[in-house]
Structure formats: C-alpha cells, structure tokens
Amino acid sequence: MSYNDTWQPKTRLGGLVQDGEVEDMSEALDTGLPLKEPEIVDQLLPGLDDEVLDINMVQRMTDSGRRVKFRCVVAIGNRDGYVGYAEGRDDQVGGAIQKAIEVAKLNIIDVSRGCGSWECGCGRPHTVALKSTGKAGSVDVELMPAPRGLGLAGGETVQHVLELAGIDDVWTRSSGKTRTTVNFAKATFNALRETSEARVPQHAREEREVIE
C-alpha cells in the first residue's frame, strides 16, 4: 500500500495506519480507536466517490451586517460497503463542499450487506442484511432487504446514499418531511449505521451471506 510521506499522524490510530500495522478500513474501525484524521480514510480507502446532495445559502444578521454562508450536504462511499455523510459550512460553495467531504470521511461506516430477503437466495451481498431504521429531525427511514433485481425502491436522495454504500436492491419506507434533503439523507445514513452496529447472529451471517 502506498502511503502519504507528508502526513504526520496525530492520533494513535493514524500512527498504526502509517506504520502498516492496520492495513484495511474494517480493521481500523474494529480497533475501537476514534477516527479523527481524514488521511486515515485516504490511505485505507483511496478513490472514494462523493455526491453533493444539497446546497443551501444561509443568511444571518450580525453587528456588521448580513452574513451569507453556504451549507452543503455530502455523501461519500466506495460503492462496496463503506459510506459516510456530513454537512459543511463555508463562505464559499467549494469550501463548504470540501469541509463536508473531510468530515464525512470521519463518519465512515462499514455497512452490513448480504442476501437478506426471503424472496431471494442468490447469496450475493446486494441488499441490507437486516431491516434497519434511521431518524433525523422529523424524518424516519426504514430499509428492508429486497430480492436481487428489484433495484432501489426509494426517493432520489435515498438512492444516492445507498448507491455509494454498495446497496443494489432495497425496500424503503419513509415518513415526515422527506422534502428536507438534509434530514432525509441523514436518516438514510443513520439506518445504514444501524446495520453496521447491529449484532448479527452467526446463523444469520451464514444463511444470508452477510458481509460486515
């Protein structure tokens, strides 16, 4: 693996990665050490794709007058089980996007995928392994395993996040103000986070070909 010679790690996990003691993202997350350096993700998951889900202009009155900032909502992923989400604010759109991408790297999760639908028995990691739910603001999102070939049965925002996570097929159910992109995207990410945090029984791993 090629490492960035100019990067000087500031955390224990960063040092382990740079020294080659931790060589993949799954191992890094399993250490339980906090992920506080985006360079760790750059090293272990190079070439991540990113998607700007929403750009909003936020105005605020200060003593010196009206101040304008941009808020960007971004999702990142390798389209093979890893996905991150974050919001970024800056005076410039480009700066807000870059800040969101850097924070999204720190929020990266390993999604549990598998062939979890009773309607399918292909054994491939094409859908979520188990039913999961996520909430953000007034929005609730439920993700359910779907048979291979169904596709992503959900809104555009949900689809973008799931595609970056490497989910090809899923049933979704949502409620609340789903037109609010920031909450819709965050609720979807939180549902995926639930899959990564769930303790999947061994028999379920075997039956559903769960990839964690």
Swiss-Prot record:
<protein>
    <recommendedName>
        <fullName>Small ribosomal subunit protein uS5</fullName>
    </recommendedName>
</protein>
<dbReference type="GO" id="GO:0019843">
    <property type="term" value="F:rRNA binding"/>
</dbReference>
<dbReference type="GO" id="GO:0003735">
    <property type="term" value="F:structural constituent of ribosome"/>
</dbReference>
<dbReference type="InterPro" id="IPR005711">
    <property type="entry name" value="Ribosomal_uS5_euk/arc"/>
</dbReference>
<dbReference type="Pfam" id="PF03719">
    <property type="entry name" value="Ribosomal_S5_C"/>
</dbReference>
<keyword id="KW-0694">RNA-binding</keyword>
<dbReference type="InterPro" id="IPR018192">
    <property type="entry name" value="Ribosomal_uS5_N_CS"/>
</dbReference>
<dbReference type="GO" id="GO:0022627">
    <property type="term" value="C:cytosolic small ribosomal subunit"/>
</dbReference>
<comment type="function">
    <text>With S4 and S12 plays an important role in translational accuracy.</text>
</comment>
<dbReference type="Pfam" id="PF00333">
    <property type="entry name" value="Ribosomal_S5"/>
</dbReference>
<dbReference type="InterPro" id="IPR020568">
    <property type="entry name" value="Ribosomal_Su5_D2-typ_SF"/>
</dbReference>
<dbReference type="InterPro" id="IPR000851">
    <property type="entry name" value="Ribosomal_uS5"/>
</dbReference>
<dbReference type="InterPro" id="IPR013810">
    <property type="entry name" value="Ribosomal_uS5_N"/>
</dbReference>
<dbReference type="InterPro" id="IPR005324">
    <property type="entry name" value="Ribosomal_uS5_C"/>
</dbReference>
<dbReference type="GO" id="GO:0006412">
    <property type="term" value="P:translation"/>
</dbReference>
<dbReference type="InterPro" id="IPR014721">
    <property type="entry name" value="Ribsml_uS5_D2-typ_fold_subgr"/>
</dbReference>
<comment type="subunit">
    <text>Part of the 30S ribosomal subunit. Contacts protein S4.</text>
</comment>
<feature type="domain" description="S5 DRBM">
    <location>
        <begin position="48"/>
        <end position="111"/>
    </location>
</feature>
<comment type="similarity">
    <text>Belongs to the universal ribosomal protein uS5 family.</text>
</comment>
<keyword id="KW-0687">Ribonucleoprotein</keyword>
<dbReference type="InterPro" id="IPR047866">
    <property type="entry name" value="Ribosomal_uS5_arc"/>
</dbReference>
<keyword id="KW-0699">rRNA-binding</keyword>
<keyword id="KW-0689">Ribosomal protein</keyword>
